[in-house]
């Protein structure tokens, strides 16, 4: 990394299914790249990239996608490790982009993996250990919406984990994963534009000067 170039940021969007996080993650990437272009940045590289987890286009992600779409069944322990493997497959990509000064915006990350596996009753210590060593986010934006409101939004129920019972359990687990040092709560009940402005305010106040770290615990 050039000495005069600040590193990129790793920002994670988390929340229940249909909480609006995917839409807002895309909007943040678009806003960052638009602002960079308007400021006269002549670089051919984007200023921000979006990474969704699972990556359903990868070989690992395709298996996960088949499970989520109810096309295949799978042991829950194997599924948890597949989700972790999917994230680790992007480990170097994330680190390389951060080193180049490119922000990486993740639609879900290890916290979803932990929350869903705990909601399904897998052993806590084992579940929490499988993602240790991944890049540590500079911020986790948790989209706060009730399971009841999320269930009323379009598309809910199309995939295996989109059930009221699982979503309620995940909603109960997520706060136990929170680290106030870098977790931020976003009220997801507002309109798209107001939520987007709130997200961008959080983004603009993040610190690029602090060292980039790896997760030591979850």
From Swiss-Prot:
InterPro entries: P-loop_NTPase (IPR027417), Thymidylate_kin-like_dom (IPR039430), Thymidylate_kin_CS (IPR018095), Thymidylate_kinase (IPR018094). Pfam families: Thymidylate_kin. PROSITE patterns: THYMIDYLATE_KINASE (PS01331). Signal peptide: none annotated. GO terms for cellular component: cytoplasm; mitochondrion; nucleus. The keyword Repressor does not apply. Pathway: Pyrimidine metabolism; dTTP biosynthesis. Keywords: ATP-binding, Kinase, Nucleotide biosynthesis, Nucleotide-binding, Transferase. CDD domains: TMPK. It is an enzyme of class 2 (transferase). GO terms for molecular function: ATP binding; dTMP kinase activity; nucleoside diphosphate kinase activity. It comes from the Eukaryota. ATP binds at residues 15-22. Belongs to the thymidylate kinase family. PANTHER family: THYMIDYLATE KINASE. Catalyzes the conversion of dTMP to dTDP. This is Thymidylate kinase.
């Amino acid at each position: 990394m050039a000495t005069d170039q600040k590193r990129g940021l790793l920002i994670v969007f988390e929340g229940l299914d249909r909480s609006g996080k995917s839409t807002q993650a895309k909007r943040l990437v678009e806003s960052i790249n638009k602002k960079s272009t308007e400021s006269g940045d002549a670089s051919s590289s984007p200023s921000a990239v979006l990474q969704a987890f699972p990556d359903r286009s990868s070989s690992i992600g395709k298996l996960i996608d088949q499970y989520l779409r109810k096309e295949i069944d799978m042991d829950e322990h194997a599924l948890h490790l597949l989700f972790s493997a999917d994230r680790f497959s992007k480990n170097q990509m994330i680190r390389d982009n951060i080193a180049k000064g490119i922000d990486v915006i993740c639609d879900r990350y290890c916290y979803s993996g932990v929350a869903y596996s705990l909601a399904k009753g897998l052993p806590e210590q084992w579940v929490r250990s499988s993602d240790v060593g991944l890049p540590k986010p500079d911020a986790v934006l948790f989209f706060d919406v009730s399971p009841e409101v999320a269930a009323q939004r379009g598309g809910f129920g199309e995939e295996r984990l989109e059930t009221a019972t699982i979503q309620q359990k995940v909603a109960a687990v997520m706060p136990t994963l929170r680290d106030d040092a870098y977790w931020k709560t976003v009220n997801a009940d507002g309109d798209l534009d107001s939520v987007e402005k709130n997200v961008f305010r959080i983004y603009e106040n993040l610190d690029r000067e602090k060292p980039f770290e790896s997760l030591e615990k979850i």
